[in-house]
Amino acid sequence: MLEEQVNALDSTVNRLSAIENSTTWRAVQPIISVLIKLKRAKSLVLYLPRIIRQKGLRNTLKYAFQVFKSGGLRTLVHTALNNSARGHVHSLTERDFINKPSVLAHEVCLNSVTIIAELSIQQCTKYRVTQKKEMLELLGFKCEVVSWTDYYQSRTSISHSSVVIFYRVPSTDTVLALIEECKRLNVKTFWEVDDLIFNEAILAESKTVSDLSSEVRTQVLEGANSYKQALLACDMAIASTSGLAESMNAEGVENVFILENCLDSETLQLANEILKSSEKKQKIDNKIRIVYGSGTSTHNIDFEEAASSIAKVLRENSQVIFRIIGLLELPSSFDGLDAQVERFELCSYSEYLRLLSECDISIAPLEKYIFNEAKSNIKYIEASIVKLPSVSSPLSAFIDVIDDGVNGYIASDQVEWFDKLTKLVCCEQTRQDMAINANTTVLARYNTESIANTQLMPIVRDYSCIKTKPRIVVFNVFYSPRSFGGATIVTEQINKLLQKHKGYEVYVVTTLPVDDALRAYEPVRYEVEGVTVFGVPVPNEDMELYNNKSIVKPVAKILEVVKPDLAHAHCLQGLGIGALQSCIDKNINYIVTVHDAWWLCYKQFMIDSKGEFCGQDKIDLSKCKNCTDNQKTPSLRDAELRHYLKNACEVLAPSSYTAELHDLNNMHPKPLTVDRNGILMPKASIVKKFDGSITFGYVGGNTPIKGSDLVLKAFSNVNNSKAFLKIVDNMINLGHKSYPDHVVSSINNCTIVPGYNQNNIDDFFESIDVLLFPSRCKESFGLTVREAIARNVWVITTDSGGVTECIIEGENGNVIPFSSDSKKLENAINNVITHYEKLKLGDDVDLPKDSIAYFSDQVDNLDGIYKSYL
């Protein structure tokens, strides 16, 4: 059985080799290669097991081999990756948070163009991709080129783009998904091509296509429909010639721009070197050479336009040689002229120009058919830069530039071909004059700067944007929809207010989880309440890295297109100091807010290997070695983090405690500036009325470090029918429970409730009277404590750092020793019950809260800090 399959594969190899070397294959090879990528790769990877079951190993091998044959291993790998994404191409839009932003892409990503292109055709890549990149950069745009077969990289590039140009791509599922992603992000799209490959009816009438086998011909015509769908899916189109533009208009595309091929700096340099080295005056012999750069055998039919005339010129002028560069089947009119025909195989571009420069006359015959009206005049341009006169067919691209008899000849029929070639053969002066005129014409008209300014700039002008407001880029480990932690809540709120009320444009860089649709370190752009967010998927195993080098490149790209004036780093966990390295590389000043002990301690909250707060103020790195397997990590980490923190133009702390702790450890040349975190102001003035019951609340999560065990044990000993305990379990909103039923069932009057957010925070605090906050670690701020006091909720807290700075003992809360056990917490609870029982029903509970800062206060303070560095 295996031997039969191997023999079948050998047969397939031989058959494919025969096809590949046939004239018909070479005629439409660029289209066929794309079709193979489309049709054979669809099932290659994602559905491989099913294919083998249904079709057998033999057909599976044939599929894989045809893809490999069309483009080699690189194409096979790209195709596999591309099609493994097929099941996920729509899943981004299925995520609620990945929404349609309110701003236009070019107002976010400044002057950034992505070209998603078919790159397998060397000449097309040179003239339509590489040249365009050079011209865009000349105009002040950043330009990135991506293969259309790389779905994920293409999608990532779209997030960074003002404009996306799809060059010569078909309408695969992945390409259409990329176009949809552009629409989601308000990115303008252009579909570009330099051949009339999108009109089935015109291709069907082409003599070249008619020569193909019925199977291949069917594939080519199907390909035309695929290209047409891609053309119509984009906003606008770009054509290489006026004839091609007219065909695009005829398909229903309203806005079509013409962008001609031009002479890039590399080509001009190459031409100049060839001219200098050969000094055309030094001829290789006394022959006069007519040259035809036929390239592939697709030009057999085109050559018929001039074939008999050229043969006649050769017969009447024995000193004339006909040089062919590439593949060409000569008709019978050339019989007996072998001595006057010289052939050169397909070669590199530099060798092609050298062979061209050795000749005297260039020809560009093209069949008089609408398909060729789309062709560019590149043969005329290439001949002109090496100072050859040309005779060309009367198609639009040539008529547009050639002044007949001055800088070239136009030949409409065999008589004109013979007459005009004869004039050039017989008169050296005519050849020289015409060559100089042609050279002058193309250097003036087709130089990169000229084409960039006259043809490309009108295409991209509307998407060129300059900053009108100062731009701040903000780094934080989490962001909506993953609004985890107090620092994240603070960051979200102040960003929104800075942008809305202080005239800044704020851009956020945060982490996202990696999954099937979100690949590691390939950012996705979305929007939260008017603020642009770049979510960088970071693998779980990298979230603990303090120096995540993989983050540098994606962050650098974001900075490159956003062009911020200042960066503000909040919590860098997950992102790491690599984000700051990107700022340094781009010469962007940055401010750091130290929201916790991450800058001081390998363990973010200074929790030692026993799960307890380590108790250090002045950090002793020798003690830190007990918390890590690698003894070198603490000192290395400390040195690196100090370097980046000292490079900050200012370091902020949310509380005096946090500022003093970092100052004690000399983390920055200047004392840290206290920038007290704000909280959300209550929607209305909340004056509580005592209703006879006392409800205690705990929101710290089911973890001993936050004191959950103290709360449960203390309250189990509280015997008062008027006292209730309400525990917030944030996991409920995620479909889980963090408190088993048996843990709380033995506690009287205890209920578990889902977590709250900034939209229903008032409702939660209105439902409790006292907040329990018996933290066993030092808190840098204590957002929940301040939210409670602002809403007239009494607080019982341990002496845990920044938390206590808003507590007025006995007036809005109680501070118990940091080392308190459950008994001390129980005593504090009973004391508060006694205090509240002294109130009468309906008495007001209005606690002092003057030390509380709101988000508006913090934004005012940050505005002043930012302005000092702008």
Residue ranges with predicted function:
Residues N199, I301-E304, Y349-L355, S362-I385, ...:
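Nucleotide-sugar-dependent
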Residues L61-A64, F68-W148, V313-R315, C465-Y521, ...:
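N-terminal subdomain of nucleotide-sugar transferases
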Residues L221, K228-V256, L263-L268, E329-P331, ...:
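A short, active-site helix/loop in glycosyltransferases that binds the activated sugar's phosphate group
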Residues I402-V415, K423-E428, E809-G810, N814-S822, ...:
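Conserved acidic donor-binding segment of nucleotide-sugar-dependent glycosyltransferases
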Residues Y151, L327-L330, Q340-C359, E367-I370, ...:
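Conserved active-site histidine-acidic residue motif and adjacent donor-binding/catalytic loop
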Residues S120-L139, L263-E358, G692-Y739:
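Conserved catalytic-core segment of nucleotide-activated headgroup transferases in glycan assembly
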Residues M1-N99:
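Boundary detector for helix-to-coil junctions that initiate low-complexity/charged tails
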Residues K276, Q429-I459, S820, K824, ...:
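A charged, aromatic-enriched C-terminal amphipathic alpha-helix characteristic of glycosyltransferases
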